[in-house]
Amino acid sequence: MQYINATEIMDDIDEPRLFEEDGVEALVVALVAPLLKPLGYRLVRVKLLGLNGLTLQIMAERADGTMTIEDCEIISKTISPLLDVQNVIERKYHLEISSPGIDRPLVRKSDFFHWQGYTAKIETRTIVNGRRKFRGALENVTQDGFILNIDAAPEEETVYVSFSNITNAHLVLTDKLIRDALKKDKNLRQQLIPEDDFNISESEINFSN
């Protein structure tokens, strides 16, 4: 097995996703994905939801995993005119631009690498060890797949899942994930904000409390 190393999982805006949408969602992907890349964003997922009548949810992020409200506004203003002109959704709908969230979908190999050690729910195309749905900790991520350490098994149980066999995958909210995700987000934001500005922000926060 060839394990993914630090060089291979460097943030890459061109890294392909493991899954593809179909139907109307696929048409939306074809329209918006080329618009996101020049702005420094990459698509995570497109989904039509029966919320508020009909909601078109577009998840996106920067290659480093960050995503702000301002980023969502930029994407919305960029893609809305094209979606209106192309009229791929004939019914009235609500457009929702969002970050992947803490319990994010895992859609690229690098997602699985970055979140090794955390709990995920996985669905497979074919039956593996008698089932298609799994929950467990991600371990030993390679270029071809990973080991899942199954939760709540009477005895220690692991299963190998190949990337080509996955139909759906996302992180599960746990105390550890929430704590570490917030810490990672704070560290990324500190890298993007000049030190003097960050110190001022911290002072203002402490003062307001």
Curated annotation (Swiss-Prot):
Superkingdom of origin organism: Bacteria
Alphabetical list of InterPro entries matching this protein: Ribosome_maturation_RimP, RimP_C, RimP_C_sf, RimP_N, RimP_N_sf
Gene Ontology biological process terms from the UniProt entry: ribosomal small subunit assembly; translation
Keyword Cytoplasm: yes
Keyword terms, alphabetized: Cytoplasm, Ribosome biogenesis
The UniProt record lists the keyword Cytoplasm: yes
Localization annotation: Cytoplasm
A Pfam family it matches: DUF150_C
Gene Ontology CC entries for this record: cytosol
Family affiliation: Belongs to the RimP family.
Functional description taken from the UniProt entry: Required for maturation of 30S ribosomal subunits.
Protein name according to UniProt: Ribosome maturation factor RimP
Source organism (scientific name): Bartonella bacilliformis (strain ATCC 35685 / KC583 / Herrer 020/F12,63)
